[in-house]
Amino acid sequence: MIKPMLAHKFDINRVDYTQPDGYYIQPKLDGVRCLFTANGAYSRNNKKFMNLKHIEMALKPFFEQQPDVVLDGELYNHGLRYDFEKIISLVRKQKPTEEDRRNAQHLIQFHVYDYFSMDSHYEKYQTRMNNLVNSDIYCASVRYVPSYKVHKHEEALNMHHDAFLSNGYEGSILRDGSTLYKHGRSYGLMKFKDFSDAEATIVGYEIGQGKRTGTLGKFLMMDDDGNKFGCPPGKGFTYKDMANMLKNIDNYIGQRATFTYFQRTNAGSYRHPLFKTLRNYE
């Protein structure tokens, strides 16, 4: 089973901006993690994606030359950054129709930010980044996620992170240039963003009131610690979407879901929780 490298939350005590290989910052994409191989594309939990034929064809020449390489990135489209469910609906198709494939070709891109192989396990990120920059794999459906070298935290936070947020990205990823690719969480890869993601189980719902009559008002959710809370649909969901959610509410009850929140209180409750998507695509 292929496992990607995962980020820890940012910890300033683990950063040394003076180390020789440097630190690099990237925009954090709010997409679907994807590992692309010569045999197809897989989720972080090893579920094969079946609706990415256009990307498979674009990468075919690369994998014919380097069949042992695994490209690490995100299925994403910045134009759909407020419509995550649209990406999910196309990515999760296990028996895509021709229309599904056409829509995926038009909307789904693979944004590459790292790679690994048997030969590259001893390559530092700085080397891997330079190899990606000079690769000829990029096209309309395969994009490179740029990295910017930073020399101090104020530069990373005030210049790049703020710019990423202003441009609609969900945060930043800080990479240690000396880090080898690790399968699992690594402090060589740290994330900082204003909102956090978490998972919980949908246990109930409330109907919308006022102008949202006839739609889903909020899901009632329970996290793994037994905390119950209300969670309205977040950005990107239209009245039609929320009406369909209410109509098909039985398909949601009991499901695991991803939600975003701003902070946790001392009592453990979530501030501004918003439903993002069902966690059934990985």
Regions found by a protein language model. Name each.
Residues P4:
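Short, Gly/Pro- and small/polar-rich lid/capping loops
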Residues Q26, V32-F36, G40-G73, Y181-E282:
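Classical nucleotidyltransferase
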Residues V15-A140, Y281:
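Covalent nucleotidyltransferase
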Residues L75, V112-S117, P146-K149, D176-S178, ...:
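Short, structured patches in soluble enzyme cores that scaffold and shape functional sites
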Residues A7-I25, V145-G168, I202:
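Phosphate-interacting basic helix/loop segments used at nucleotide- and nucleic-acid interfaces
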Residues T18-D21, L29-D30, H106-L107, S166-Y169, ...:
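Short, well-ordered loop/turn elements at secondary-structure boundaries
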Residues M1, S147-S196:
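Amphipathic alpha-helical
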Residues V133-S141, L165-E170, N227:
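Secondary-structure boundary elements
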